[in-house]
């Protein structure tokens, strides 16, 4: 079964907590602090598997969690790092943040990988906080929290050439003739319900991959038929072969078909509409009025499409010349990565030292992940801990920001449940 979209939940490992420990050995009166650091939590990493061709595996398992880091211990023992969790995805997978729909990564090469959830850093043990004036710190850092998010995976097939056109115009037949692909072929609409890939080999020319893109009809860019499901697969192609039924056996006008398909491309993606396009007037073996082809060709050329081939996939007439032109055109177009605009790109927030300050009456409230982490690390009833607490607030710019906001002596500063009076 071909599945090209999936939504999964990923969660990295939490960092291990630092240890609060003091050396206790016979004949050593003042052993000092010896609490070790916590281990780093495991990452969740998406890695490309060139042998995968579908996202089917993610319909059976949707939640993935990496291993947490181990806690530190006495004797300066460091916690064990959590193992990274590697999730295999097909080549050509786009990774999106499910909440914002922003693009996090484009995994389009065999060696590509992406850390989709970073493991938390291990907390420092109390031996890390010794100074000449603080020789017995009784606090340690907790491990950094894990990252968790829902992500969307979208598979965009990696093909050099895309076959587009209305249903039943002969795209699958053409694919089967020029490659070893064996798509389902029948005389009714939507015979092809998934994109099919084939490799075209031309003597003296490097091979290229061609894809039969099904389901593009009028209104496809707005979700009619199967269009939206498969239009994404055209995005990576460098050349489009627009297959037209020149015989009009189904009663449609070839030129009208040409205009409608191009209008759908334009509505879906303007850059896709501007991609090099070769017109393949198929089913010429059923065309009994040669003037009809010439009339169609003249109209199409007025739109700037000068490569119009009269072919018959059934009899292979003109097919070789069509493929040679596709190969020639490909040789002039460099392979480029999928363009991701700044508007669509996901930007990872720095969560370690984030905080915000707001004022309510004469109380200044400091909130954020930085505050939670700091309060978990210190004992506010211990004078040494309080001095360290004040130093961190000063170093991270909290005190300076409070003064810029106009704080005065005696005003209350609140961090979660802890309050203190501000003194200049």
Curated annotation (Swiss-Prot):
Q: Which GO terms describe its biological process?
A: ribosome biogenesis
**What are the OCT domain coordinates in residue numbering?**
345-424
Q: Where in the cell is it found?
A: Cytoplasm
Q: Does the keyword Cytoplasm apply?
A: yes
Q: Where along this sequence does the record place binding of GTP?
A: 165-172, 190-194, 212-215, 282-285, 312-314
Provide this UniProt record's keywords sorted from A to Z: Cytoplasm, GTP-binding, Hydrolase, Magnesium, Metal-binding, Nucleotide-binding
Cofactor dependency = Mg(2+)
Q: Report the SUPFAM superfamilies cross-referenced here.
A: Obg GTP-binding protein C-terminal domain (SSF102741), Obg GTP-binding protein N-terminal domain (SSF82051), P-loop containing nucleoside triphosphate hydrolases (SSF52540)
Major location, coarse class?
Answer: cytoplasm
GO molecular function terms attached to this record: GTP binding; GTPase activity; magnesium ion binding
Q: Give, as one word, the top-level EC class.
A: hydrolase
EC number per UniProt: 3.6.5.-
Which ranges carry the Obg domain? 1-158
Of the GO CC terms on this record, one is: cytoplasm
Which residues span the membrane? none
What InterPro entries is this protein classified in?
G_OBG, GTP-bd, GTP-bd_Obg/CgtA, GTP-bd_prot_GTP1/OBG_C_sf, GTP1-OBG_CS, GTP1_OBG_dom, GTP1_OBG_dom_sf, OBG_GTPase
Per UniProt, Mg(2+) binds at 172, 192
Entry-linked PANTHER family: DEVELOPMENTALLY REGULATED GTP-BINDING PROTEIN-RELATED, MITOCHONDRIAL RIBOSOME-ASSOCIATED GTPASE 2
Q: How does it assemble?
A: Monomer.
Family label: Belongs to the TRAFAC class OBG-HflX-like GTPase superfamily. OBG GTPase family.
Q: Tell me the function of this protein.
A: An essential GTPase which binds GTP, GDP and possibly (p)ppGpp with moderate affinity, with high nucleotide exchange rates and a fairly low GTP hydrolysis rate. Plays a role in control of the cell cycle, stress response, ribosome biogenesis and in those bacteria that undergo differentiation, in morphogenesis control.
Q: Output this protein's name.
A: GTPase Obg
Instruction: Give the encoding gene's name.
Output: obg
